């Protein structure tokens, strides 16, 4: 046809057979990418330390999505929760990846078949003999089938009636595992952090989809509505489909960035708001306070804090700390976490307990300031020593560790105290291996950040695509230069200006 590059799919506009072919090929590409990406991630994934080197620290992108849907075992003999297994079954990580690749191959062959055999009887209008699609009927079919899939997922897969269930965890991401979920039909089902809402909403939405699909299969649209919404134009389908996709992309960008039951922190990493609000820090202090109330020593109380909980309370796991254009996993940034050094407790020479003010998310550098329990500044690391009043040396600050690898160790040397005060700005202190991956020490974002950025960006792009194609289909006659109020039969080529009888061409 000699179309320019930006006309992309115009070639299949009036060709239902090949329109179907390119959509099947698109599905083949998507499924093929998913399967291949899964195999690549499995090849580089290290499952040995699910606490300090989980999937999200390693930059895994598709493994978390498989895991939240109930896949936990590998044909390599490991489980995502740690330990070894002997019989992973067919639906392991590799099994799912292989199924996607096989499906991709079948779609590839189907796409070729439909490209070659494009002129099928099913695409022909009996009355005119020309290629034609009954778009309202196709809409009904798709709505019905997607409703069945949606209902089936909620009623069988999520509930464990016929399926594994989904990943469910506690609010602090410590006890996560795959389990069946009962639908939440009360008001609690609208809480985005309640897993039961996933089951109930899929059942409800699926039921609605089935009923709506049957409605559109059995009821024809009124002529005025059909013409007003251009229901006979395939570009209307494109426009409304893009709308559905960009709306979904905006929704999942939100649920990922702000957190929800569908995006567990064990699989995707914590959210930035958990750092901003001191979410894990408060829980750690609550547990320590409970231990002290039970007559435990500080050392005993801090030693009972799970390493996993302490690791969440570290700024390097904040997805907003990594720049959008810093490629690589979190492990490539600050390194692979080896162990928790323990909680540093600072005191001045008068015995007051001091707390290091933590670095806010969007700061790269931050002054080291130590405050007492009332928030009064008692010590700092000054920029200009000549004018300092609260320096570590002047105030006589010491540090002692509780829990972790340095449990019971104390330091009074100012240089060492300042070193740990600087590190305490970043939350709990961990030993990090930067040699293995040649990590550069610059923070990276987690898959939570990448997913959000990608989906928000494409949602914005697709929003403009919806406006573009929607206006093209609604105002097609205007763009073509044909007056919609013109009743007379227009003979193309009879006038110099289309539809203007005053410009009739003169026959010489």
Swiss-Prot record:
The chain crosses the membrane at residues 21-36, 101-115, 140-156, 203-218, 237-252, 457-472. GO terms for molecular function: chlorophyll binding; electron transporter, transferring electrons within the cyclic electron transport pathway of photosynthesis activity. Belongs to the PsbB/PsbC family. PsbB subfamily. Signal peptide: none annotated. Its main location: plastid. One of the components of the core complex of photosystem II (PSII). It binds chlorophyll and helps catalyze the primary light-induced photochemical processes of PSII. PSII is a light-driven water:plastoquinone oxidoreductase, using light energy to abstract electrons from H(2)O, generating O(2) and a proton gradient subsequently used for ATP formation. It is a multi-pass membrane protein. One of its GO terms (biological process) is photosynthetic electron transport in photosystem II. The keyword Membrane applies. InterPro entries: PS_antenna-like (IPR000932), PS_II_antenna-like_sf (IPR036001), PSII_PsbB (IPR017486). Binds multiple chlorophylls. PSII binds additional chlorophylls, carotenoids and specific lipids. PANTHER family: PHOTOSYSTEM II CP43 REACTION CENTER PROTEIN, PHOTOSYSTEM II CP47 REACTION CENTER PROTEIN. It is found in: Plastid, Chloroplast thylakoid membrane. This is Photosystem II CP47 reaction center protein. It comes from Populus trichocarpa (Western balsam poplar). Gene3D superfamilies: Photosystem II CP47 reaction center protein.
């Amino acid at each position: 046809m000699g179309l320019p590059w930006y006309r992309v799919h115009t070639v299949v506009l009036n060709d239902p057979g090949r329109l179907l072919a390119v959509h099947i090929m698109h599905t083949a590409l998507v499924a093929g990418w998913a399967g291949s990406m899964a195999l690549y991630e499995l090849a580089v994934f290290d499952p040995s330390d699910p606490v300090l080197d989980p999937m999200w620290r390693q930059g895994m992108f598709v493994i978390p999505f498989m895991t939240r849907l109930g896949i936990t075992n590998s044909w390599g003999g490991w489980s995502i929760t740690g330990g070894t297994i002997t019989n992973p079954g067919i639906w392991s990580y590799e099994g799912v990846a292989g199924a996607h690749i096989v499906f991709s191959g079948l779609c590839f062959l189907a796409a070729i078949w439909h490209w070659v055999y494009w002129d099928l009887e099913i695409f022909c209008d009996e009355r005119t003999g020309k290629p034609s699609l009954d778009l309202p009927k196709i809409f009904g079919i798709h709505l019905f089938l997607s409703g069945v899939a949606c209902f089936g997922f909620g009623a069988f897969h999520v509930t464990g009636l016929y399926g594994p269930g989904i990943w469910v965890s506690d609010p602090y991401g410590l006890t996560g595992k795959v389990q069946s979920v009962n639908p939440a039909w009360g008001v609690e089902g609208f809480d985005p952090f309640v897993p039961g809402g996933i089951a109930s909403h899929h059942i409800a939405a699926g039921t609605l989809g089935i009923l709506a699909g049957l409605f559109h299969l059995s009821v024809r649209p009124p002529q005025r509505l059909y013409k007003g919404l251009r229901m006979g134009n395939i570009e209307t389908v494109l426009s409304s489909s893009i709308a559905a996709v960009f709306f979904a992309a905006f929704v999942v960008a939100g649920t990922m960035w702000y957190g929800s039951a569908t995006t567990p922190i064990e699989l995707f990493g914590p959210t930035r708001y958990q750092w901003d609000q001191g979410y894990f820090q408060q829980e750690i202090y609550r547990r320590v306070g409970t231990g002290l109330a039970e007559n435990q020593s500080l050392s005993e109380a801090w030693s009972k804090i799970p390493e996993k909980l302490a690791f969440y309370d570290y700024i390097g796991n904040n997805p907003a700390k990594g720049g959008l254009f810093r490629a690589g996993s979190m492990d490539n940034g600050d390194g692979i976490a080896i162990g928790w050094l323990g909680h540093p407790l600072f005191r001045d020479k008068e015995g007051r307990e001091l707390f290091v003010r933590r670095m806010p998310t969007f700061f790269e550098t931050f002054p080291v300031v130590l405050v007492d329990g009332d928030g009064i500044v008692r010590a700092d690391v000054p920029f200009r020593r000549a004018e300092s009043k609260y320096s570590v040396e002047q105030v006589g600050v010491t540090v002692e560790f509780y829990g972790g690898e340095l449990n019971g160790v104390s330091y009074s040397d100012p240089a060492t105290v300042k070193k740990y005060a600087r590190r305490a700005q970043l939350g709990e202190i961990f030993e990090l291996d930067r040699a293995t991956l040649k990590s550069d020490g610059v923070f990276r974002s987690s898959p939570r950040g990448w997913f959000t950025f990608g989906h928000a960006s494409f949602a914005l792009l697709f929003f403009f695509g919806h406006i573009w194609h929607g206006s093209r289909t609604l105002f097609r006659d205007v763009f073509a230069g044909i007056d919609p109020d013109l009743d007379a039969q227009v003979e193309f080529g009879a006038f110099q200006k289309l539809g203007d009888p005053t410009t009739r061409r003169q026959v010489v």
